[in-house]
Curated annotation (Swiss-Prot):
Pfam families referenced in this protein's UniProt entry, alphabetically: Holin_SPP1 (PF04688)
Subcellular location(s) per record: Membrane
GO cellular component labels: membrane
Protein family per UniProt: Belongs to the SPP1 holin family.
Main location group: membrane
Membrane topology: Single-pass membrane protein
Name of the protein: Uncharacterized 9.7 kDa protein in cwlL 5'region
NCBIfam families: holin_SPP1
Transmembrane segments: 44-64
The entry's keywords: Membrane, Transmembrane, Transmembrane helix
Record flagged with keyword Nuclease: no
Organism domain of life: Bacteria
Amino acid sequence: MKNLDKGTVIRTVLLFVALVNQTLIMFGKSRLPISEDQVNTLADALYLAGSTIFTIVTTLVAWFKNNYVTSKGKLQKETLKQKGLTK
């Protein structure tokens, strides 16, 4: 147990809690007071947050990759202009 990192211990404990909860639900006894509406609300919020983060990151990466914003990029643009390969 001394060789396990904190993340492994946390994931193992959460897995155990989830398995116990699922077993109790199978026998008709819910131990975690979580309603289906709460789960749906959380899922919707996580989806919205994930979509927003994905859109922002993708937009920034595409903008950075498609524009000459670094000094190296500006040199590349000048080289392309000199060789007639860009507008």
